[in-house]
């Protein structure tokens, strides 16, 4: 989350990053179901300690990564009337910021190309796994932007080229349809 210090000394939520609840490192504690934190609210206490009593709110979170922590939120910069929630803070937010940057780029490319072009990010340390995470959901695109500006190098590129140069081994087409695809439109089980 992005916060700013209010003239009252309490800290205001300026931005809450969306997360991906399927990944422990990409979850966003203030955006998790049931938390209902809102931009504009004030973090007025952490584990009962008023945030206006410290210079740096983050000092109250030292050693609290992945530990249930009570946060008091209020629409006003005051303790009275605050509601208490329990979150498990992240150790770092870099992964969450990077995930949101990638999601924003996917949306921009999709919008600019009317859904015809996909976007695959720089594939950091997870390399081919990260490539697969973004490649396979975009198989139906006419083209791909593979953004490797921040890639540190290595042996991933030949593996990516191998995936990109594969020929379809089967095609599907419904009777009377003009649409041909490499993936089924539906699966019937049972």
Question: Where is each model-derived feature located?
Answer:
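Cleft-lining beta-strand/loop regions that shape enzyme active-site pockets
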Residues: 20-30, 44, 49-190
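PDZ/PDZ-like peptide-tail recognition elements
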Residues: 1-25, 111
């Amino acid at each position: 989350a992005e916060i700013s210090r209010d003239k009252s000394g309490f800290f205001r939520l300026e931005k809450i990053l969306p997360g991906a609840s399927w990944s422990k490192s990409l979850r966003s504690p203030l955006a998790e179901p049931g938390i209902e934190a809102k931009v504009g609210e004030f973090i007025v206490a952490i584990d009962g300690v008023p945030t206006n009593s410290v210079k740096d709110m983050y000092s109250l979170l030292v050693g609290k990564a992945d530990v249930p922590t009570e946060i008091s939120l209020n629409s006003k910069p005051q303790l009275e009337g605050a509601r208490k929630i329990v979150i498990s803070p992240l150790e770092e937010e870099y992964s969450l910021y990077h995930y949101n940057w990638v999601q924003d780029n996917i949306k921009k490319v999709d919008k600019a190309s009317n859904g015809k072009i996909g976007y695959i990010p720089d594939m950091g340390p997870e390399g081919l796994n990260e490539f697969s995470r973004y490649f396979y959901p975009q198989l139906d695109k006419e083209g791909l932007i593979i953004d490797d500006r921040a890639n540190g190098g290595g042996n991933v590129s030949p593996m990516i080229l191998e995936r990109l140069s594969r020929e379809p081994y089967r095609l599907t087409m419904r009777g009377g349809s003009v649409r041909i695809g490499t993936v089924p439109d539906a699966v019937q089980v049972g």
